[in-house]
């Protein structure tokens, strides 16, 4: 980190707190930081505004919402780097930028857009860039900006249990390491509380179910997830819900707000 002037941390706009690696703040120390709320097209725009305001209050931090649907903002990142470090970015002094982020937050897509060509493989499963991007550690961008990539790594212990669920729901944890029924139940309960109208519209319901179990059963019935004897296949129904959340089929969803996280953190600290 001694040769880094600025850090870009890429997070998932649907779960900014849960996808923010706490080790980044320790590593960057006094260096300015651009926090990217990526995949903002999949996140609730009103809640994204709350998060941008929240992060902009931090010392030395500028937050920016980005989406693959609008590459112009991504391509403007070098200009933002120069604004944060006006004394660098000249022919004499380049701005040395390190880009960091947990798996599957869209870091590879961001790098490819900035570079104007494919340097890192893009995929829906975490850690697909590990082997492909080796040897592509340093990228020279427009305006004498040197961008260094780092592997996407989850920190060893996640203290907030709800964050673990949110990371699984949005795809930051490999499918082979999760219980679909467990995380789908978590997601279903949240959607009933926060986005009941979208649930009703997507699954053509007369009214929103009272519980997550009931919602998963409704999805199973309406999507033909039935076993012998008409028993609902809860595994298949769970996979459908998680897939439709990740793909944006349910609309723009956010799974945490600054106020929600403040309350959860206070509860954890009290214990």
What are these regions (language model features)?
Residues 1-6, 13-33, 40, 46, ...:
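Helix-rich effector regions associated with P-loop NTPase G domains
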Residues 27, 39, 111, 115:
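Short, conserved active-site entrance elements at the starts or edges of catalytic domains
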Residues 34, 40-102, 119, 224-226, ...:
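Canonical P-loop GTPase G-domain recognition
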Residues 81-88, 114-122, 126, 154, ...:
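Short, well-ordered alpha-helical segments in soluble proteins
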Residues 92, 113-114, 139:
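Solvent-exposed alpha-helices and their adjacent loops that cap or buttress functional pockets
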Residues 97-122, 150:
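Glycine-rich phosphate-binding P-loop
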């Amino acid at each position: 980190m001694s040769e880094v002037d600025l850090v870009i941390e890429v997070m998932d706009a649907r779960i900014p707190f849960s996808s923010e690696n706490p080790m980044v703040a320790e590593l960057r120390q006094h260096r300015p930081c651009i926090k990217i709320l990526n995949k903002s097209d999949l996140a609730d725009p009103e809640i994204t505004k709350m998060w941008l305001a929240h992060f902009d209050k931090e010392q030395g931090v500028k937050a920016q919402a980005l989406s693959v649907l609008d590459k112009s903002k991504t391509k403007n990142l070098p200009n933002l780097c120069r604004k944060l470090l006006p004394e660098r970015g000249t022919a004499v002094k380049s701005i040395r930028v390190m880009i960091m982020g947990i798996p599957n937050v869209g870091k590879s897509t961001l790098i490819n857009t900035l570079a104007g060509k494919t340097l890192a493989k893009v995929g829906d499963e975490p850690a697909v860039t590990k082997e492909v991007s080796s040897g592509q550690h340093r990228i020279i961008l427009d305006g004498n900006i040197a961008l260094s990539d780092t592997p996407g790594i989850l920190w060893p212990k996640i203290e907030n249990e709800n964050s673990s669920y949110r990371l699984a729901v949005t795809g930051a944890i490999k499918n082979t390491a999760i219980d679909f029924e467990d995380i789908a139940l978590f997601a279903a309960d949240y959607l009933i509380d926060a986005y009941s109208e979208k649930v009703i519209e997507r699954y053509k319901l007369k009214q929103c179910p009272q519980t997550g179990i009931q919602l998963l059963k409704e999805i199973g019935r309406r999507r033909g997830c039935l076993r012998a004897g008409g028993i609902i296949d809860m595994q298949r129904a769970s996979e459908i819900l998680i897939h439709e959340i990740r793909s944006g089929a349910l609309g723009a969803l956010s799974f945490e707000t600054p106020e929600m996280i403040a309350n959860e953190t206070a509860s954890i600290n009290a214990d």
